């Protein structure tokens, strides 16, 4: 995959997300290597938990932790690692871990991909049980890994998500 050819934004309201980890997959953390374009196994998680949503990143962005902006894509189906999916950001999970701030953008597929998410415009439109599952996952997925921890500090709205995405794009443009 030539990541250099994939833009961060498809248009003003749509972001491109490169999937690293499919929803409900085994307890394996994959990471996309930007130089080779390959998906590597980062580690086998010690907890027997699976990601509640498809997990990936926005290309050509840089978050406060030095990695691309992370995204959880709410969908009905697992998406193959390395796939690019067009999404709309609807909110953000605010959290910290042993490396610092580590926010997760919450996004849904665009109408062209799946019209069943058209009603979700803001984080408040996302199912409460799914939000609880997301929080539970991130509060516990590192529990058995020595020296690792996560603290979920809350949820923020679409405006905050959009702001974090823009900041991530600007960091890369200044490099």
Curated annotation (Swiss-Prot):
Its EC number(s): 3.6.1.1
One Gene Ontology term from the biological process aspect of the record: phosphate-containing compound metabolic process
Keywords: Cytoplasm, Hydrolase, Magnesium, Metal-binding
CC annotations in GO: cytoplasm
Gene Ontology terms for molecular function: inorganic diphosphate phosphatase activity; magnesium ion binding
Coiled-coil region(s): none
Regions crossing the membrane: none
Record field: catalytic activity: diphosphate + H2O = 2 phosphate + H(+)
Residues binding Mg(2+) 1: 65, 70, 102
Top-level division of the source organism's lineage: Bacteria
Cofactor: Mg(2+)
Pfam families for the chain: Pyrophosphatase (PF00719)
Binding, Mg(2+) 2: 70
Localization terms from the record: Cytoplasm
Keyword Nuclease: no
EC supergroup of this enzyme: hydrolase
InterPro entries named in the record: Pyrophosphatase, Pyrophosphatase_sf
Keyword Metal-binding recorded: yes
Reported function: Catalyzes the hydrolysis of inorganic pyrophosphate (PPi) forming two phosphate ions.
PANTHER family found in the cross-reference section: INORGANIC PYROPHOSPHATASE (PTHR10286)
Similarity section: Belongs to the PPase family.
NCBIfam families: PRK01250.1
Name under which the protein is recorded: Inorganic pyrophosphatase
Protein's organism: Rickettsia bellii (strain RML369-C)
């Amino acid at each position: 995959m030539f990541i250099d050819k994939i833009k961060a934004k498809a248009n003003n309201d749509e972001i491109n997300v490169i999937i690293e980890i499919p929803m409900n997959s085994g307890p394996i953390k994959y990471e996309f290597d930007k130089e080779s374009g390959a998906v590597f196994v980062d580690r086998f998680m010690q907890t027997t938990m699976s990601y509640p949503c498809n997990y990936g990143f926005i290309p050509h962005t840089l978050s406060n932790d030095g990695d691309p902006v992370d995204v959880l894509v709410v969908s009905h189906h697992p998406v193959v690692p390395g796939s690019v999916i067009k999404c709309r950001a609807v909110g953000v999970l605010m959290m910290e871990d042993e490396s610092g701030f580590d926010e997760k953008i919450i996004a849904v597929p665009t109408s062209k991909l799946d019209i069943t998410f058209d009603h979700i415009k803001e984080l408040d439109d996302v199912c409460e049980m799914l939000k609880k599952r997301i929080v539970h996952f991130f509060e516990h997925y590192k529990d058995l890994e020595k020296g690792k921890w996560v603290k979920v500090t809350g949820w923020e709205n679409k405006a905050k998500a959009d702001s974090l995405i823009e900041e991530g794009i600007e960091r890369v443009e200044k490099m």
